[in-house]
UniProtKB/Swiss-Prot annotation:
Gene: proA
Family per record: Belongs to the gamma-glutamyl phosphate reductase family.
Main subcellular location of this protein, as a coarse class: cytoplasm
E.C. designation(s): 1.2.1.41
Keywords: Amino-acid biosynthesis, Cytoplasm, NADP, Oxidoreductase, Proline biosynthesis
UniProt protein name: Gamma-glutamyl phosphate reductase
CDD domains: ALDH_F18-19_ProA-GPR (cd07079)
Protein's organism: Pseudomonas syringae pv. tomato (strain ATCC BAA-871 / DC3000)
Coiled-coil parts of chain: none
InterPro entries: Ald_DH/histidinol_DH, Ald_DH_C, Ald_DH_N, Aldehyde_DH_dom, G-glutamylP_reductase_CS, Glu-5-SA_DH, GPR_dom
Function, in words: Catalyzes the NADPH-dependent reduction of L-glutamate 5-phosphate into L-glutamate 5-semialdehyde and phosphate. The product spontaneously undergoes cyclization to form 1-pyrroline-5-carboxylate.
Length: 421
């Protein structure tokens, strides 16, 4: 690449800004044609995708990439199938762009309401998983946004092959190629450039490790949609159905250890701890989960001692911290102090207790008699998600199509003048 990284990224940004005006006014039918054509292109390019992915896997193995990272990097036939299905699912979703709500007449005679519109240009920074290229591109396209995708250097060949399929889909729908651009350089300076171009980029979505997200949050001059940690809790109250609670807690932890909605700390009311914990601990041990507990927990079951650091830790592994609490007040206090505002659950049949938990736990998702593993855009009926936000401005929780849009006021009159009867 002869031009500098900054010049290259500026060129991408300028092209994305111009393309955003085209995709922003594209019809739903045209956007869906692009998605369906991209799905067909992926299906036809399976051999090319597998060959490109093999290059990335070989490079990763030669450079000591961890097995978990290699697993996320692999584009298996099943994952290609999943990408194709995902594109078709997004095409089937309702288009939020242009929806108008809350139209009402004011005393002056004007009508005031809100219209949903695209954000503009979305920059997405992610690691390892090449399927994110399709997930992100499809959601941004359907919501009327141009996007710049900066994947990890370990997936560069896979991402280029996927980008070629997206370009075919856009061309078949008569849309400019710059609607979806994949950053072709592996130079890390590209990230710094992307997050500091507010004239071209409207929002950044980082998806990856804590280090990446902290860097983007610290250095960005563009608004960021993100979450740092998924320190999720399940509180089993004194009013819980204990067999139900055991099933919920087990699923919350063991459905998948590596998801951000996995339970990391189990809180148990002191009045039922002696009845609940022995059977619960036995089930976790049978699954191979390492248990750590507070002093009161260790009086009831044989577990390793939990330290202060454990309450702050997102394990993303088969490790669970357990704390016995005096009641609802201590459970809420613990969650709001140690939690990451992601997803937290209560198991209880007491309605006033449930209402307090829902109102007072400061998290983007609050579950009642359901595991935190449900924290997912597909499970919420969004069809897909670009990520999960634990922030409070713009989007909170799983971010789907609507989260990639915003609202503007529309005002309709018939010649009324302010200050005139």
């Amino acid at each position: 690449m002869t031009e500098s990284v900054l010049d290259y990224m500026t060129r991408l940004g300028r092209a994305a800004r111009e393309a955003s005006r085209v995709i922003g006014r594209a019809s739903t039918a045209q956007k869906n044609r692009a998605l369906q054509a991209t799905a067909a292109a992926l299906d036809e390019a399976r051999d090319e995708l597998s060959a490109a992915n093999a290059l990335d896997l070989a490079y990763g193995q030669a450079n000591g990439l961890e097995p978990a990272m290699l697993e996320r990097l692999a584009l298996t036939p099943a994952r290609i199938d999943s990408m194709i299905v995902g594109l078709r699912q997004v095409a089937s979703l309702a288009d939020p762009v242009g929806a108008i709500r809350d139209m009402s007449y004011r005393p002056s005679g004007i009508q005031v309401g809100k219209m949903r519109v695209p954000l503009g240009v979305v920059g997405i920074i992610y690691e390892s998983r090449p399927n994110v290229t399709i997930d992100a591109a499809s959601l941004c396209l359907k919501s009327g946004n141009a996007t710049i995708l900066r994947g990890g250097s370990e997936a560069i060949h896979s991402n280029r092959a996927i980008a070629a399929c997206i370009a075919r889909g856009l061309a078949e729908a008569g849309l400019p190629a710059a609607v979806v651009q994949v950053v072709e350089t592996t130079d890390r300076a590209a990230v710094g450039a992307l997050i500091t171009m507010p004239e071209y980029v409207d929002v950044i979505v980082p998806r990856g490790g804590k280090g990446l997200i902290e860097r983007v949050s610290r250095d960005a001059r563009v608004p960021v949609i993100k979450h740092l940690d998924g320190i999720c809790h399940v509180y089993v109250s004194a009013h819980a159905d204990l067999p139900k609670a055991q099933k919920i807690a087990f699923n919350a932890k063991t459905y998948r250890y590596g998801i951000c909605g996995a339970m990391e700390t189990l809180l148990v009311d002191q009045t039922i701890a002696a009845d609940f914990l022995p059977a619960m601990a036995a089930q976790f041990r049978e699954k191979g989960v390492e248990l750590r507990g507070c002093e009161r927990t260790r009086e009831l079951i044989d577990v390793m001692p939990a330290t202060e650091d454990d309450w702050h830790t997102e394990y993303l592994a088969a490790i669970l911290s357990i704390r016995v609490v005096s009641g609802l007040d201590e459970a809420i206090e613990h969650i709001n102090h140690y939690g990451s505002h992601h997803s937290d659950a209560i198991v209880s049949d007491h309605q006033s207790q449930i209402r307090r938990f829902m109102a007072e736990v400061d998290s983007s998702s609050v579950m009642v008699n359901a595991p935190t593993s449900f924290a997912d855009g597909f499970e919420y009926g969004l069809g897909a998600e670009i990520g999960i936000s634990t922030d409070k401005l713009h989007a909170r929780g799983p971010v789907g199509l609507e989260g990639l849009t915003c609202e503007k006021y529309i005002v309709i009159g018939d010649g009324q003048l302010r200050g005139h009867a």
